[in-house]
Amino acid sequence: MSDDFVSFLRNNRDILCGDALASAVMRLYRLNYNNAHLAPLPEDYWQTIAQVNGICYDGAEVYGVNSPLKVFKDLITQNQNLHTSHVVVLGENETDWLVFDTGEQKYQLVDKDEESVLYSTETFENAINYILRL
């Protein structure tokens, strides 16, 4: 994720961003994630979450990682009961899920009701833009 985009998120008064994570905290969380046997996530996801641990804007949310503020939903908690080996839910808005599909190796917006793919991209930055409707 570009530094300009992180600055844009942090400097926008309407967007709530979680704090950056210390590298030791991030390593521990990734270990816990791996131990939860969830589908693997790409590096750009982890790099972003280390800089901006959760994002909320206008009814949309990108999940954080075990945020002490409890403002953001936790990635592991949100995915533990899904029982899917190739998709991880990363966030949501009122009508769509933001997921990473490991088979396609793409971030996708999926309609909550119809479960159809509405948008697909290779970068987490583009996916954030789309789910938050920026």
What do the predicted segments below correspond to?
Residues 105-112:
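Short aromatic-glycine-(Arg/Gly/Cys) micro-motifs in beta-strand/loop hairpins
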Residues 116-134:
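Compact, glycine/acidic-enriched structural inserts
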Residues 98-100, 109, 118-119:
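Short helix/loop capping segments that flank catalytic or ligand/cofactor-binding pockets
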